[in-house]
Amino acid sequence: MRRALSLLGVVLALCAATPSAQTPPKTLDIYYVDTEGGQATPFVSPTGQTVLVDTGNANPPGRDPQRIMEAMKAAGAKQIDYLVMTHYHGDHVGGFEELAKLTKIAHIIDHGPTVQPEQKHDAYDQALKTTPYTVAKPGDKVPVTGIDWLIVSAAGKTLKTNVAGAPGAGKPNPYCAEFKPKDIQSDLENGQSTGSLITYGKFRTIDLGDLLWNVEFDLMCPTNRIGTVDLYLTSHHGVDWSGSSTLVHALAPRVAIMNNGTRKGGQIAVDEVLESSPGLEDLWQLHWSFNGVTEHNPPGRFIANIEDAATTAAIVANPPPPATQPLGPPVPRAGGAGGAGGRAGGPAAAAPGAPQLGNPAHSPAYWLKVSAQNDGTFTVFNPRNGFSKTYKPRS
């Protein structure tokens, strides 16, 4: 009996000495909040710090800030330790005023003065007078414990040194040879976007805001300074002013997430670049895309928000004309959302006779959640249908 008790004691002691076997690994959690074609992305570090990239739209009033708060509550986040504002179009900064009433924003990081004075936001400008504030430059770090947050673009400038230790960084980019510049107005806030490369152990993800096509060349050529990534947030919501093969194919992401709206982004040219990207396993989207029609949307389990069956049938029966993007001045910020149909704001208007899609206040609205481990494993979860997929580290 004593021998049996002694052996039992050894077993219990061993179990007590190895709690890690029972404890889930700490993760970097990312919530791609549905802002109907804008951006609001909370990152919650393994130590509990929260970095929010952008604040979504102003209209409908309170919608996007409330969705951000719901994601933060789900993550157990108490405040925003750092707000990284990519640029000042209404679909990225519009929710700031209401969000600041709902939670503490401890520190703001942005690219500095706007290049489009008509895009000024008084509440944001006032907050900069009382909130700790940093103007980002390529090469700067956001001091988040346990992860490496590197600024790779800001104010039209890009990183000029190779990311130390990054897989593939410093090698010639073969996709530079196929780059063709686009005739895109250069003095836009999009091209000023504060872009971030976030690394947690062996997991790497990149968020470039709305960085423009021609600036992507400056970042990635002639040398790939970034290296490869595991997860790519499609630039500019999947609008074809961004997302060149020179960028995407060199990054060689395993997974892409598109923060599109029903009628904004998801353009076929962007989809084709993704579909031909070496090593891409899956595309996830916040919305079923009218622009992508049936041929280019991913399977439904990879989409956070889907229209009802009757609306989807109408989309299939009435495919849209080829999408175009205006090259003229920005549409005025009606209600602070960057314009109703311009490149900077909410979903584009439906073509005459096309089905009206995308209830802008629909509820519930679903995010996509990514949980990344420091060994490079990450899982994408779709709460609409409970579907998740885990991606093991690159071999």
Regions found by a protein language model. Give the residues of each.
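Conserved beta-strand hairpin/beta-sheet module of binuclear metal-dependent hydrolase folds
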Residues: 23-79, 189-217
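Internal alpha/beta domain cores that form substrate/cofactor-binding pockets in large enzymes
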Residues: 116-121, 131-132, 229-299
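Active-site metal-binding motif and surrounding structural segment of the metallo-beta-lactamase
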Residues: 25, 46-52, 56-110, 114, ...
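Flexible, acidic/histidine-containing loops and adjacent segments that form or flank the divalent-metal
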Residues: 22-28, 93-218, 276-282, 287-394
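Bacterial N-terminal signal peptides
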Residues: 6-16
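Divalent metal-coordination and catalytic microenvironments
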Residues: 33-34, 43, 54, 87, ...
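Acidic/histidine-rich helix-loop elements
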Residues: 52-66, 161-185, 236-241, 263
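Positively charged n-region of N-terminal signal peptides that target proteins for export
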Residues: 1-4
